[in-house]
């Protein structure tokens, strides 16, 4: 890709538009600035903003096939080489307010040695972190370094979320040891989050591994080494995800067993109560018929005697159940 003027990258809809100064900082893109590999430009767009969508459709600084991909719908992480540039799709943990972390956010990047164009549909915290480092003069110095920094920030957020899920599983395990059944749906949500992460982070790990192995002209050997380390770290996170999924299966079985045991105890208690009061129910039904000849019907203490007999009968049945070790 030949050098071009900064005015070709300027438009009102950009979220961020800066030129890397090659020293870890950034400067605004000027109309007369020449974009080259020593000072690549970074253009961050929100593809839902009409001005950005129009610019992507009209610009000549990227190939036609890239325009559609940068403004497209969410897909799984992947990497595609297109001539001198590379098109990369990655996923970020959703750290926006009032959003679940497992509702992952997509970031699409077209990157060359002179140009970085990234697009989003929802805010991505990793982008803001890289921008903060650049404003403080501690950011990436070139295109390859920028990509490694983004991959590292995304992986940091993923690792933190995996650790949070791990802690939640430990809390559930501790509750079960204390015979406490977790709230309805809590385990199902954790399991869903684990599965979603597993689905998208596996291809993302593969993307990082492929980038580290590709001989991309705009990446230094040190950047490739760091990218491989990031891929390895994400791979270890995926192993933790697999272990966590297995643990949730055990937890589900334990919860089912605990609920079944509680139900059995209640059923057993009701059965014992039925056994205790069955004889008394029979006698009260028998003596309650409106027929003549009921024993003690005319005696002044007949009702008291009958109640005392029922108490003795209940006590006898309870003693028998206790002796038989049913109680």
UniProtKB/Swiss-Prot annotation:
Pfam families: CorA. Keywords: Cell inner membrane, Cell membrane, Ion transport, Membrane, Transmembrane, Transmembrane helix, Transport, Zinc. This is Zinc transport protein ZntB. It is a multi-pass membrane protein. One of its GO terms (cellular component) is plasma membrane. SUPFAM superfamilies: CorA soluble domain-like (SSF143865), Magnesium transport protein CorA, transmembrane region (SSF144083). Its main location: membrane. It catalyses: Zn(2+)(out) + H(+)(out) = Zn(2+)(in) + H(+)(in). GO terms for molecular function: cobalt ion binding; cobalt ion transmembrane transporter activity; magnesium ion binding; magnesium ion transmembrane transporter activity; zinc ion transmembrane transporter activity. It is found in: Cell inner membrane. Residues 1-271, 322-327 are cytoplasmic. The chain crosses the membrane at residues 272-292, 301-321. Zinc transporter. Acts as a Zn(2+):proton symporter, which likely mediates zinc ion uptake. Disulfide bonds: none annotated. It comes from Pectobacterium atrosepticum (strain SCRI 1043 / ATCC BAA-672). HAMAP family: ZntB. The gene is zntB.
């Amino acid at each position: 890709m030949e050098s071009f003027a900064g005015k070709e990258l300027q438009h009102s809809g950009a979220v961020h538009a800066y030129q890397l100064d090659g020293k870890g900082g950034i400067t605004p893109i000027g109309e007369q600035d020449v974009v080259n590999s020593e000072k690549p430009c970074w253009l961050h767009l929100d593809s839902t903003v009409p001005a950005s969508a129009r610019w992507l459709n009209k610009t000549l600084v990227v190939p036609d096939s890239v325009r559609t991909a940068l403004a497209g719908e969410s897909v799984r992480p992947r990497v595609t080489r297109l001539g001198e540039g590379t098109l990369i799709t990655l996923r970020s943990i959703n750290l926006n307010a009032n959003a679940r972390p497992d509702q992952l956010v997509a970031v699409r990047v077209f990157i060359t040695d002179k140009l970085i164009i990234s697009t989003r549909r929802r805010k991505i915290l990793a982008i803001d972190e890289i921008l903060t480092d650049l404003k403080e003069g501690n950011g990436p110095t070139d295109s390859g370094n920028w990509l490694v920094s983004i991959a590292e920030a995304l992986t940091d957020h993923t690792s933190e979320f995996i650790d949070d899920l791990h802690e939640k599983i430990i809390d559930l395990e501790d509750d079960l040891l204390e015979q406490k059944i977790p709230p309805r749906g809590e385990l199902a949500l954790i399991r869903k989050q684990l599965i979603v992460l597993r689905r998208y982070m596996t291809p993302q790990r593969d993307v990082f591994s492929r980038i580290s192995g590709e001989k991309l002209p705009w990446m230094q050997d040190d950047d490739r080494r760091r990218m491989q380390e990031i891929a390895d770290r994400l791979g270890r996170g995926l192993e933790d995800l697999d272990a966590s999924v297995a643990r949730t299966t055990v937890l589900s079985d334990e919860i089912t067993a605990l609920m079944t045991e509680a139900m059995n105890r209640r059923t057993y208690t009701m059965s014992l109560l039925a056994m205790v009061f069955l004889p008394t129910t029979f006698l009260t039904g028998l003596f309650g018929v409106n027929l003549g000849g009921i024993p003690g019907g005319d005696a002044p203490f007949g009702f008291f005697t009958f109640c005392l007999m029922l108490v003795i009968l209940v006590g006898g049945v309870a003693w028998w159940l206790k002796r038989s070790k049913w109680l």
